C-alpha cells in the first residue's frame, strides 16, 4: 500500500489535495503493533494523514493508538470515525491528538427512518398533504444550494 501512496503523492498536482491513509489493523484484529507499523510506513511513503478505525464500542484502543502514534509523530494529522465508539466527545479525542472527526453515516442513517415514515404516510393517504409539516420548504433547499 505504501507504493500506492507514493505514486499518488508523485502524481499530485496541487497542495489542495491530501492523501489520508486508512488503517484497518484494529478492525481486522491484527493488533496495535501492526496498526502503528502501518501508520509509520504510510507517513514515510508520503501520506498526509492517518485515519484509524475500530469496530469496538469502547474507544480505549483508538485512544491507545493515538497516544502511541503521537509519541513518535506529533505533526501528521490523525482522523477518526466514531461510528461504533460513539460515546467519546470531540474534545476527548483532541486531548489524544486527533485532528479530524468524521461522522461517516449518522446523517444518512437518521434520514432513512424519516423517509420511511413519510413514504408510509403517502402510501396510506395516497397523497402528500399529511407530510407537509415534515418537509423542508423548497425555498430553504434553494438557499442551501446557493451557499454551495
Segments predicted by a language model, with ranges:
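Alpha/beta enzyme core
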Residues: 1-101, 110-120
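Extended, intrinsically disordered, low-complexity segments
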Residues: 106-148
Amino acid at each position: 500500500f505504501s507504493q500506492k501512496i507514493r505514486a499518488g503523492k508523485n502524481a499530485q498536482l496541487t497542495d489542495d489535495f491530501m492523501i489520508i491513509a486508512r488503517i484497518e489493523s484494529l478492525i481486522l484484529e491484527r493488533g496495535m503493533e501492526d496498526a502503528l507499523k502501518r501508520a509509520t510506513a504510510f507517513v514515510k511513503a508520503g501520506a498526509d494523514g492517518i485515519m484509524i478505525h475500530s469496530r469496538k464500542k469502547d474507544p480505549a484502543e483508538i485512544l491507545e493508538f493515538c497516544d502511541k502514534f503521537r509519541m513518535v509523530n506529533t505533526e501528521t494529522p490523525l482522523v477518526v470515525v466514531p461510528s461504533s465508539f460513539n460515546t467519546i466527545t470531540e474534545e476527548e479525542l483532541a486531548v489524544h491528538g486527533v485532528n479530524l472527526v468524521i461522522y461517516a453515516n449518522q446523517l444518512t442513517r437518521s434520514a432513512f427512518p424519516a423517509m420511511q415514515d413519510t413514504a408510509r404516510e403517502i402510501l396510506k393517504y395516497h397523497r402528500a398533504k399529511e407530510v407537509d409539516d415534515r418537509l423542508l420548504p423548497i425555498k430553504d433547499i434553494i438557499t442551501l444550494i446557493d451557499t454551495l
